């Protein structure tokens, strides 16, 4: 807080600069905003907790952002309201420094979370083959923890111990502001680092995100889903290993049959050489396969996803070898960056050469992936995630820009900004914490429905709300 209400030397003889009805109005408005902020962000946190469809990596970042906004609603808003209506700081220097440290740490954590959300979406869109492999809950937790720890290191020590570093406390009794903000160069530098630089980075990232998303949606619209080849020319990477002469049981005497099992794919006895799919992430709603050779035991293989097993029967005299390929696909689970997998197993005879074998595998993969391609989620899901990020980014810029512009002006001309304008600008930064939950609800129907169920106490099946 760069300027404060002037106080006398004892700081206790000051009366409020506002009239009684103005004080009542300020308290009512500020109290209402605080209450809405608290309720809204609690709804966000509870919704993510109880609704499994909201438990995605992207929403874990929103959960962290909601935690920061909740702290602002509980502490920062109410203490600043007290400071404003009374006209001086009545709680002493220790509480003042603790409040300022908490205020700036959580505010900076909000900015850091916004940066994380922007980078996460950017990598999802621009690196769909590699980034989702690294995009785990553990990684998200580490990034969130880093945002909070970095924010604490940047602000808390400087705010709490600056008076001891310089050897004197220059903040007068009855006032509460960050002491090192009296230095114009420091004020200018912190404004650049805390607002202008993050805004520039997030704006550039969003521009790339929007461009990539529009390009993808445009491409999908040009290609009718019914006529699309669900498998790209580079789908099968690497050659299928040629069958060897290991003796093992054959099929069912030339018959062709399909087996679809949920969870387990039983194997016949004997040694099997299997080409197992290497999980390689693809872009949203697409399928990719990468084959690598591995030996597998003849026991049951349990998977999280459905296992589809296709066997081509041969005469019992043929030496055969089992070949399997894992198809890694992407499902839309809210953040458009979640991989799933399906395993295709083929048994071929030793009489087939490598090219024929690979052609059979490719045809089977086409057959497997054709049906999911018809059920491809509409481009609106892609737009939903991008729209949410845009709403959060715009809310952040609109609410934080006035105060940070005033900070730069104050560096060169302190008397140019009236006290009331400072107060409004500072409050706008707080209002960002009130707006964020509304952004989630307006841009995400699942959040909106879950909020409604919670507010109306409809808890039945709330965990499955889409």
UniProtKB/Swiss-Prot annotation:
One of its GO terms (molecular function) is arrestin family protein binding. Disulfide bonds join 96-176, 413-416. The chain crosses the membrane at residues 23-45, 60-80, 98-119, 140-162, 185-209, 388-410, 419-442. It is found in: Cell membrane; Postsynaptic cell membrane. One of its GO terms (biological process) is regulation of heart contraction. Gene3D superfamilies: Rhodopsin 7-helix transmembrane proteins. The keyword Ligase does not apply. Residues 1-22, 81-97, 163-184, 411-418 are extracellular. Glycans are attached at residues 2-3, 6. Residues 218-320 are annotated as: Disordered. The modification Phosphothreonine is found at residues 446, 450, 465. It is a multi-pass membrane protein. Residues 254-270 have a biased composition (Basic and acidic residues). GO terms for cellular component: cholinergic synapse; ciliary basal body; Golgi apparatus; nucleolus; plasma membrane; postsynaptic membrane; presynapse. Interacts with ARRB1 and ARRB2. Interacts with RACK1; the interaction regulates CHRM2 internalization. Belongs to the G-protein coupled receptor 1 family. Muscarinic acetylcholine receptor subfamily. CHRM2 sub-subfamily. This is Muscarinic acetylcholine receptor M2. It comes from Mus musculus (Mouse). The lineage of its organism: Eukaryota, Metazoa, Chordata, Craniata, Vertebrata.
